[in-house]
């Protein structure tokens, strides 16, 4: 099955979402949504007065055309990937349908 759109999900260190979005826009992305998150997968287990501390993260969601996805993900990885302060990882998921997005030819 061919999908016209993909959801690119990026998980990165808090405060570096501008690096991700700058790279994504340069590769053709129109925009994205940034959410604040806490990482819970690590084994750090640090506590402060019995309260568990988790790494602060940002998550960026970008809806992209399927034929632009690889270039956007490559740009994110090169400019904000694991070897940078942003420490971003990204993956994509197919989107079966969308509503409310501007079409390519609408500019």
Regions found by a protein language model. Name each.
Residues 1-107:
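Positively charged, small/polar-rich N-terminal and surface patches that mediate targeting and assembly
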